[in-house]
Amino acid sequence: GTGEGWGAGAARGAGVWKSTNGGTSWTQLSATSSFYYVNDLVVRNESGSGVLYVATRGNYYGQSWHGSATQGLQRSTNGGVSFSQVLPNIPGESQNFAAADIEIGADNKLWVGTTTSSYGLTDRGGGRILTSTNGTTWTTAYTHSSGERVEVACAPSNTNYAYALIEASSQVDAIVKTTNNGSTWSSVSEPSDADGGISSTDFSRGQAWYDLI
């Protein structure tokens, strides 16, 4: 996936590229040419077939906003020939969620961490964790009211455990975990950085919107 979606100096990408020879050569999936900012992609086993999911967002580039029309979670069931956007709209807005991160749980459940959408919205859609068992119907498992970018990690050995790190105003605003597959969440203390020259929990150096990569 191409495009640097994290920052005002974002470089616009050219969609998703595919290799069938171990990375020796690549071809663009033509259906993704307008996926300007690809944040993540995964292939999920669905009834024996590989289904491709691509996390996309819009961003400001060259004096204008690009990618809003294709932001969200793009799903392909035919090897990338065509895609459909499967995330729901942000509540109260006509724009769907933008996806920052995609994870697949040990039970094959999909977890998506959102990020903020384009300016001009009352609710820009950040700070959410969305889950799905079929890839098309979604549940909001967690909302952090001031959150922006969300990164998720699922325990590979226990379907009940997942963790999320949530950015707000360039800082790590919260770390949360679930021990019951997303039904409830609790806070986790931020780790203390070994660098004594900064505040103990500033491991992202005030760039959590970027340094979570």
Where would I find each of the regions flagged by the language model?
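Extracellular glycan-interacting surfaces
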Residues: 1-213
